[in-house]
A protein has these predicted regions:
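C-terminus-biased signal that marks the final domain/tail of proteins
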Residues: 41-198
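A contiguous strand-loop segment
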Residues: 1-34, 60-65, 132, 151, ...
Length: 198
């Protein structure tokens, strides 16, 4: 699940199938993440607002969440479960392993918590153009090379409020199946946010 807000927050999440013992437990009781995500994108003005809400909400499942703040040029990765939540930046990013090294001023996660091949390939693609990564580079050389985003890929330029998005092929469509191999559309969210609602 992904989203972008008019307060220059970008958010993404992925379910965790390969947790380690640092995750804590899951529960069927709590606020479903779709509503957590909507609240954050609708009401949070800053990264701190979003993190505070996540810390206090009745969480349910294992997720990895990324939230970036275009106003502050910073981001956090969040280890999210019913009984535990942990917030990571570039200095304490987890899981810390040879296959998931830390990168100054960056947080990243590839496909799952314990997923060495995706994590390391993502690390390689980020560091190949470190400091010069553009949305176009991300689309052509990160998501497509790492092969992450079968169903959906969203790339945010939070400083310019531009969203690039691709979706996997529907059953009645032709062309590549995976979203990362398909055509991206570019949306100027400044225009979208300025639209007058009917």
């Amino acid at each position: 699940m992904t989203g972008m807000s008019s307060s220059m927050l970008g958010m993404t999440s992925i379910g965790v199938e390969l947790p380690d013992d640092t995750f804590g437990d899951e529960s069927r009781i709590g606020l479903p993440f779709i509503f957590v995500s909507r609240y954050i994108l609708q009401y949070s003005e800053t990264l701190d607002d979003a993190l505070s809400y996540i810390a206090d909400v009745h969480r349910m499942c294992h997720l990895i969440i990324g939230i970036a703040d275009g106003k502050l040029n910073t981001a956090r990765m969040i280890q999210y479960s019913h009984s535990k939540v942990a917030f990571f930046d570039d200095l304490n990013l987890q899981p810390y392993a040879e296959w998931h090294p830390r990168i100054p001023n960056a947080v990243y996660n590839g496909m799952d918590w314990l997923c060495p091949s995706y994590q390391y390939k993502l690390y390689q693609q980020i560091t190949a153009k470190y400091g010069q990564i553009t949305p176009e580079y991300t689309i052509q050389n990160i998501t497509a090379v790492v092969k992450t985003g079968d169903v959906h890929v969203a790339v945010y330029d939070l400083t310019e409020n531009i969203l690039y998005v691709a979706n996997g092929r529907a059953s009645n469509e032709q062309g590549p199946k995976a979203a990362y191999d398909r055509q991206f559309i570019k949306l100027d969210m400044n225009v979208e946010y300025a639209r007058i609602q009917p």
